[in-house]
Amino acid sequence: MRAAGKVGSLAYADRRRRFGFEYNGMVLHEYYFAQLKPGSSIDQAPGFKAAVTEQFGSAEVWHEDLVSAAKSRSVGWAIAYYDGTTGQINNHFIQLHEDGNVGGFVPLVIVDVFEHAYMVDWKALGRADYLAAVHKNMNWGVVEARFQAARSGQIFKRF
């Protein structure tokens, strides 16, 4: 549309308005799928595990907090972010794809809690079972790599 000289059109303005939703949806799905792998253990993420244990008291308590965010009465994403300023890991619920992302925070663990993620296999009331399956299939090596990159101020690639 830019090349066609339609930058001032309503259609172009609408595409710009929706760009954050569409693009962030793609990016968050890339993060989500990149971190899934059966047979991994949180022990493969020693730095991440130590950080959440120090901050939350244990990795299990951190996980319960993330699941609590994921069970919010809405659809969206549960994301464990790293705050590079404070060094803290924060669990957040993000509605849609672009609403609620914290500027400057780095996503470490991303859980898709839109219905399409669990309805086919776990049905309408199966969100808790789906969340357990995601945790069981988390690729903790990817989480550790994200954590180490974020902690050192590097930007990690989505895929």
Name every feature range the model reports, one short phrase each:
Residues 1-159:
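Feature for soluble, non-membrane regions of globular proteins
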